[in-house]
Design a protein with these regions (language model features):
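Conserved NTP-binding catalytic cores of kinases and kinase-like/nucleotidyltransferase enzymes
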Residues: 1-85, 215, 341-342
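An alpha-helical support segment within catalytic cores of ATP-dependent transferases
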Residues: 4-15, 145, 162-204, 214
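Active-site acidic catalytic loop and adjacent metal/ATP-binding pocket
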Residues: 31-40, 47-48, 187-235
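ATP-binding pocket architecture of kinase catalytic cores
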Residues: 41-143
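A glycine-centered beta->alpha junction motif in the catalytic cores
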Residues: 101-119, 161-170, 292-309
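A cross-family kinase active-site recognition segment
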Residues: 118-176, 199
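Active-site activation/catalytic loop segments of kinase-like enzymes and analogous catalytic loops
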Residues: 235-276, 291-308
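ATP/Mg2+ or Mg2+-diphosphate-binding catalytic cores
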Residues: 296-342
Length: 342
C-alpha cells in the first residue's frame, strides 16, 4: 500500500482547497499503526492516523466515541484528548479500498505536550498519579451516558479468539493452554458482581510515552488511542502498575504480572481509592483483566499491534510466562487487605 497516496486522497476528500507540502512519518516503531505529521503550504500542521487492522466499523465507532468524550469532558480534563477534524459536524473518517487493500484514515489537531514522567517514579509521584487517574476515571464516568454506544465487549473478543482456535489450532502455539485460559476468563466473569462494575471509556495502554503532565503532575494531554474501548476501569490498572513499578517504564518491555503485586502499585491504588473508591470484587477481577489483555491484545491481535519482532517475542512469552503466571502469581487478597476493603 502507498500510505502517502492514501493520506493525500483522504485529505482531498476532506478539503481539496488546502494543499499538502510534506508528510512525515512519526509512528512509534513498536506498532504497526501509522501516524503522520502533515504540513500544508500555508504552514498549518495536523496529524493523520492510518490503520488497516480489524474492522472499519470499529475504527469509525471508536473515533466517534473518543471525539464525543473529548468534547464532553469537563475541567480540568477538557483539553486532555486530541480533537478529530470534523466534516459536516461528524468525525471525518476516510476509507481506502482497492483490491485486497483496505485502510482507514482519521485526522487530528496536534496534541499540546508538557512534561513526561521520569522512567522511574518516586513515592510522591506515584501518589499523585493515583489521585489523577482516580479523578480522570470519575470524569469519564460522569459523561458515559452521553457517549455513542459501542458494539465491542470483552466477551465478543474472547469468542473471536476461540473461533480462530477452532479454525486453526496451530495459529498461536499451545492451543490447549490458550483455550483453557479463554474458558477460565469466561467462567470467572460470573464469579464477581460484575453487574455493579461501571462501563466507562478506557485507553488501556498507558506508558510514559503517550501522556504528558503539568509541573504539578496533573494529567495534561493524552495521545495514542489504539486500544481504546468502552469497558471496565480495571483494564487501565495493569499498565499503571508498570508505570509505577520498581523497574520503571522500559523501552524493551515484557508484560509480566509482577508489577501488580508490588508495594508501589498498592501505594498507587490507595491514593486512587481515596478519590474514587474501588470494591473488593473489582480488585479480584484485576487478574481477569490481565488475562484478557494477554489473550486479546498479545495473542489474538499482537501481530497487528506490534511490529513482527516484538509480536513474536511477546506471543512466545505469553504462552511460556504470562498465562501460566495468572493464577499462580497474583493474590488479590493482599491488595484487598492493604486497602482495608474487607
Amino acid at each position: 500500500m502507498d500510505f502517502h497516496l492514501i493520506i493525500k486522497s483522504a485529505w482531498e476528500g476532506y478539503d481539496s482547497s488546502k494543499t499538502i507540502r510534506d508528510i512525515e512519518d512519526i509512528s512509534a516503531m513498536v506498532s504497526t499503526n501509522h501516524v503522520y505529521r502533515i504540513t500544508f503550504h500555508d504552514e498549518d500542521i495536523i496529524i493523520a492516523k492510518l490503520s488497516f487492522f480489524g474492522k472499519f466499523e470499529h475504527f469509525k465507532e471508536d473515533h466517534r466515541i473518543i471525539q464525543s468524550l473529548s468534547n464532553n469532558l469537563l475541567y480540568p480534563f477538557e483539553n486532555l484528548l486530541s480533537k478529530s477534524l470534523l466534516k459536516n459536524n461528524r468525525v471525518y473518517v476516510y476509507r481506502y479500498k482497492h483490491g485486497k487493500d483496505d485502510a482507514w484514515v482519521v485526522f487530528y489537531n496536534p496534541t499540546r505536550m508538557l512534561d513526561r514522567l521520569p522512567r522511574r517514579l518516586n513515592n510522591e509521584q506515584i501518589k499523585k498519579l493515583g489521585t489523577q487517574l482516580g479523578k480522570f476515571h470519575k470524569a469519564c464516568s460522569r459523561v458515559k451516558n452521553v457517549l455513542p454506544k459501542s458494539s465491542k465487549t470483552l466477551r465478543t473478543d474472547i469468542y473471536d479468539l476461540q473461533r480462530q482456535l477452532e479454525k486453526n489450532p496451530d495459529k498461536f502455539g499451545n492451543a490447549d493452554l490458550i483455550k483453557h485460559h479463554c474458558e477460565q476468563f469466561l467462567k470467572n466473569r460470573s464469579r464477581y458482581n460484575m453487574k455493579s462494575f461501571e462501563i466507562i471509556p478506557v485507553f488501556i495502554d498507558w506508558n510514559i510515552g503517550n501522556f504528558s503532565v503539568t509541573p504539578d503532575l496533573d494529567l495534561y494531554s493524552r495521545w495514542d488511542y489504539d486500544w481504546f474501548r468502552m469497558s471496565y476501569r480495571l483494564l487501565d490498572f495493569y499498565f499503571f502498575s508498570r508505570v509505577v513499578s520498581d523497574a520503571g517504564d522500559r523501552t524493551v518491555f515484557s508484560y509480566v504480572i509482577g508489577p501488580m503485586m508490588e508495594e508501589r502499585f498498592i501505594t498507587f491504588l490507595k491514593e486512587y481509592h481515596e478519590v474514587n473508591p474501588i470494591t473488593a470484587d473489582e480488585i479480584r477481577f484485576l487478574k481477569e483483566a490481565y488475562r484478557f489483555f494477554i489473550l486479546n491484545y498479545v495473542i489474538k491481535d499482537g501481530k497487528y499491534f506490534f511490529n513482527e519482532q516484538y509480536a513474536k517475542k511477546l506471543q512466545t512469552e505469553a504462552v511460556e510466562i504470562y498465562l501460566p503466571s495468572v493464577d499462580r502469581d497474583f493474590d488479590a487478597e493482599v491488595i484487598i487487605k492493604a486497602l482495608k476493603l474487607e
